[in-house]
């Protein structure tokens, strides 16, 4: 549960996280099971195990890729369209069980939900939020973290993501103010250094939001479908198992679900587009949509209000 402080002048402050975690069913469990991800125990130099990946060599360039990049404002990268597509669609992901034992999925969801509020309050770019959550999951998978420092860790990850994605950075003191002074500016900067050290400065991550834009442009999706798919993609941030999905599969699942809801049960993306973007395999498998109604009961009312 999240609380807000009383209004101070013309603005309001976001209050600290209240430690109340209630178990809830995972609304994306059926989708996660259908992604056919295989666990991997291979180690990588930055200290945490690599998740399942699909080799970029298996990706075929879909027709209309150059036009899709142009629609996203990437005209200068047309020469490298195939390499860009392979890089953003398939990259290393985190293992499905990446959380420390002391951190439950409900605790993580609470921190991410609070970060969504801070992200909206500051008016940050969408890629900043996805990168912040990725850094949070990477840090949690790399080692232990104290429970009373989860909020500090989340804010520090958002601060690092702002340095990667934003032109104007929020002041560290203002981030502390939004947290109701739960930690000091010096503690925030120390947390930033710990993140950089533990992750070995591996901060770049092509998030699923770019993949969604590419797939929507390739499929010719309507703005309504794109908006609904973006909502589903943002809801997946609350799910810890979503960190184990390749960005391309994650975006394709959200886009296909949006098409099915708005265009009818028989509507879905072209199978050849899936094969090009995911290197084979199936997004849906043989799972039904029996968990679909639970999406509307997620406790993140902030996300529903945003869309």
From Swiss-Prot:
Signal sequence extent: none
Gene Ontology MF term list: cyclin-dependent protein serine/threonine kinase regulator activity
Pfam families cross-referenced by the UniProt entry: Cyclin_N
Alphabetical GO biological process terms: G1/S transition of mitotic cell cycle
Gene Ontology terms: cellular component: cyclin-dependent protein kinase holoenzyme complex; cytoplasm; nucleus
Localization (cell): Nucleus
Broad class of the protein's primary localization: nucleus
InterPro entries: Cyclin (IPR039361), Cyclin-like_dom (IPR013763), Cyclin-like_sf (IPR036915), Cyclin_N (IPR006671)
Record bears the keyword Nucleus: yes
Function: Seems to be involved in the regulation of proliferation and migration.
The protein, known as: Cyclin-P
Native species: Homo sapiens
